[in-house]
C-alpha cells in the first residue's frame, strides 16, 4: 500500500557502493511497474557528476581546507547543477502523475566537509556544512550529512539499503583497481576507497527524528524510514514482495530470472559501468552465494591480505571493523517478511 493511495510519492533508495542496489532494481523491474519512474541514470545517481570531480586524484588527496578557490567553486557549482537537474526531472515526472523511485549512494551527495572529516579527520576549524540552494528552505541539521537541506530530504520517503561491510568494502576496492590500477588505488592513503556505513546510520536517525514531517499518513509514519539488507534481497524474495506492497508497487511484476547479456551488448557498455556490474550482466538470476551467511571477518581479512597485499588488507579490515556497529544497528531494524 502506498504512502498516499492515488497520489504520486517520492521514494529514495539510499545506499553505499556494492550493496546490490543494481540487483534490487533488476528484481523490482521498474520499467514494468505501473505509475513509477526511476532516475534517468542507473535508477538515479543524480549527484554522480559531483562525485566524479571529488574522486579526481588532485581533489581527493587533500582535505577541503587545502582546496583552491577555483576547486571549491567547481565542486559547489557541480552540486548545484546536479540538484537542479534532479529538480527538473522530478517536476517533469510528477506532472505526469507518476511516483518516483530514485537511488543515490551517500558518498555521491555527502557534504564535502563530512567527506573531508571522514577521510582526514575532523578539522579544528570546521567550516559550515555545504548546502545547495533550494527555494523550500535551507535548514541543515547535525544528522544531515548531505548537501541537501532538511526541507528537501523530508519530501521523500527513504529506504536504506545495507550490506555486510566484509562483502561491500573489498568489492568496491576491486572495482577501483579495475578502474584505476593497483598503484593509483592505493595512493594517498587509499583516498580512492571512500566508503562508510556511518552516513547511512546518521541519515536514518535524521529521518527517525523527523518522522512526523514525512509525506505519509500518520498511521504509516512509524514504518518510515525503511531498511533493506542485501541478504534478504538475495535469499528472501518474500521481503522484497512485502516492500513492494508497502511502497505501492506490484509484487506480481517482480523479476527473479532474466537473460544473460550477449557479448555484443557488453561491448557497448562503458568500461566503468562494466566493472561495477559485470557479475549482474553475466547472470541469469540471483546468486545466493553472494549473501553474508557464515561470513567471518577474521577469515576474510586473511583472504584480503592474500588478494591485495598486507597494507591494503589491513586497511580494508580496519574499515570493515569500524563499520560493523553501524551495520548491526541498521540490520536490527531492517524490514523482514516474518515480522511485517
UniProtKB/Swiss-Prot annotation:
**Into which EC class is this enzyme placed?**
transferase
Pathway(s): Secondary metabolite biosynthesis
Query: What are the entry keywords?
Result: Transferase
GO molecular function, a single term: transferase activity
| Keyword Transferase appears in the UniProt entry | yes
Function, in words:
Sulfotransferase; part of the gene cluster that mediates the biosynthesis of pyrrolopyrazines, secondary metabolites showing insecticidal activity. The role of ppzF within the pathway has still to be determined. The single multifunctional NRPS ppzA is sufficient to produce peramine via condensation of 1-pyrroline-5-carboxylate and arginine, N-methylation of the alpha-amino group of arginine and reduction of the thioester and the cyclization to form an iminium ion resulting in release from the peptide synthetase.
What name does the UniProt record give this protein? Sulfotransferase ppzF
Q: Which organism is it from?
A: Metarhizium rileyi (strain RCEF 4871) (Nomuraea rileyi)
Amino acid at each position: 500500500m502506498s504512502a498516499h493511495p492515488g497520489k504520486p510519492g517520492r521514494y529514495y533508495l539510499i545506499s553505499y557502493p556494492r550493496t546490490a542496489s543494481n540487483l534490487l532494481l533488476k528484481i523490482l523491474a521498474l520499467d514494468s511497474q505501473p505509475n513509477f519512474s526511476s532516475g534517468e541514470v542507473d535508477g538515479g545517481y543524480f549527484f554522480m557528476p559531483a562525485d566524479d570531480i571529488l574522486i579526481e586524484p588532485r581533489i581527493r588527496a587533500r582535505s577541503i581546507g587545502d582546496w583552491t578557490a577555483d576547486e571549491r567553486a567547481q565542486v559547489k557549482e557541480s552540486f548545484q547543477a546536479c540538484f537542479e537537474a534532479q529538480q527538473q526531472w522530478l517536476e517533469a515526472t510528477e506532472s505526469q502523475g507518476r511516483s518516483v523511485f530514485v537511488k543515490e549512494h551517500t558518498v555521491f551527495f555527502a557534504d564535502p566537509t563530512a567527506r573531508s572529516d571522514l577521510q582526514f579527520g575532523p578539522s579544528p576549524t570546521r567550516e559550515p556544512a555545504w548546502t545547495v540552494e533550494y527555494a523550500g528552505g535551507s535548514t541543515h541539521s547535525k544528522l544531515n550529512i548531505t548537501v541537501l537541506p532538511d526541507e528537501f530530504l523530508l519530501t521523500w520517503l527513504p529506504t536504506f539499503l545495507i550490506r555486510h561491510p566484509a562483502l561491500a568494502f573489498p568489492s568496491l576496492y576491486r572495482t577501483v583497481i579495475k578502474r584505476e590500477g593497483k598503484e593509483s588505488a592505493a595512493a594517498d592513503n587509499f583516498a580512492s576507497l571512500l566508503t562508510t556505513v556511518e552516513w547511512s546510520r546518521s541519515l536514518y536517525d535524521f529521518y527517525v527524528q523527523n518522522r512526523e514531517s514525512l509525506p505519509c499518513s500518520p498511521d504509516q509514519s512509524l514504518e518510515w524510514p525503511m531498511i533493506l539488507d542485501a541478504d534478504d534481497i538475495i535469499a528472501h524474495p518474500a521481503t522484497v514482495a512485502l516492500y513492494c506492497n508497502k511502497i505501492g508497487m506490484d509484487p506480481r511484476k517482480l523479476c527473479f530470472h532474466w537473460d544473460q547479456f550477449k557479448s555484443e551488448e557488453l561491448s557497448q557498455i562503458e568500461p566503468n559501468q562494466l566493472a561495477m556490474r559485470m557479475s549482474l550482466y553475466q547472470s541469469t538470476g540471483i546468486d545466493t552465494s553472494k549473501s553474508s551467511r557464515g561470513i567471518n571477518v577474521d577469515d576474510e581479512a586473511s583472504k584480503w591480505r592474500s588478494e591485495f597485499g598486507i597494507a591494503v588488507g589491513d586497511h580494508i579490515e580496519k574499515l570493515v571493523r569500524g563499520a560493523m556497529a553501524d551495520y548491526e544497528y541498521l540490520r536490527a531494524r531492517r524490514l523482514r517478511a516474518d515480522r511485517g
